[in-house]
């Protein structure tokens, strides 16, 4: 696993299982029970098993930790936010492009990220999904995902979205 994989820990709750085990902020979770972890969704999905064998990267070292969690209790681990996948469409109606200048920066983020849809209810057109993303959505039962449908006619859809997909 390279340095660009994993989910970085932002905070450890004092007195938690993670705190007692020696896991620390800045550690990067590489896997849980042999399953690769890339973001918050992977972490939540795989951390529900009760017994967690975690592989963590700390600087240039790989460390193993074993946690036992009770059902309904969290591990005490808070992850840093993942990098949002941005939109590559050139929609003729894009509200982000129509915003006035001078608003807060976060309003100008054109996200097209199914993870944001699942976690926060953002709408997506699904034009940038990879085969791996589709597989993950099914395997992890990521629902609901809010889909922005503007036309079911493929030619019209491509024209409206400004995207050949």
Predicted regions and their residues:
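PDZ/PDZ-like groove recognition
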Residues: 1-13
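A residue-level detector for short acidic-glycine micro-motifs
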Residues: 11-14, 31, 45
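Conserved PDZ fold ligand-binding element
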Residues: 18-38
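N-terminal functional module detector in eukaryotic proteins
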Residues: 24, 38, 53-54, 90
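N-terminal alpha-helical targeting/anchoring segments
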Residues: 37-45
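PDZ-domain C-terminal substructure recognizer with occasional recognition of PDZ-binding tails
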Residues: 44-78
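Conserved Radical SAM active-site core
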Residues: 62, 71-165
């Amino acid at each position: 696993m390279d340095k660009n994989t994993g989910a970085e820990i932002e905070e450890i709750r004092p007195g938690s299982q993670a705190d007692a085990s020696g896991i620390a902020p800045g550690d990067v979770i590489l896997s849980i029970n042999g399953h690769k972890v890339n973001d918050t969704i992977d972490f939540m999905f795989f951390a529900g098993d009760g017994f967690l064998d975690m592989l963590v990267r700390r600087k240039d070292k790989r460390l193993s930790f074993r946690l036992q969690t009770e059902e309904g209790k969290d591990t005490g681990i808070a992850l840093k936010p993942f990098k949002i996948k941005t939109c590559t469409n050139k929609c003729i109606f894009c509200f982000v492009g129509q915003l006035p200048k001078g608003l807060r920066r976060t309003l100008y983020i054109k996200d097209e990220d199914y993870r944001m849809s699942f976690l926060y209810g953002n709408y997506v057109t699904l034009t940038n999904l990879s085969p791996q993303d589709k597989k993950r959505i099914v395997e992890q039962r990521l629902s609901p995902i809010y889909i922005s449908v503007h036309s079911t006619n493929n030619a019209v859809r491509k024209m409206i979205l400004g995207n050949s997909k």
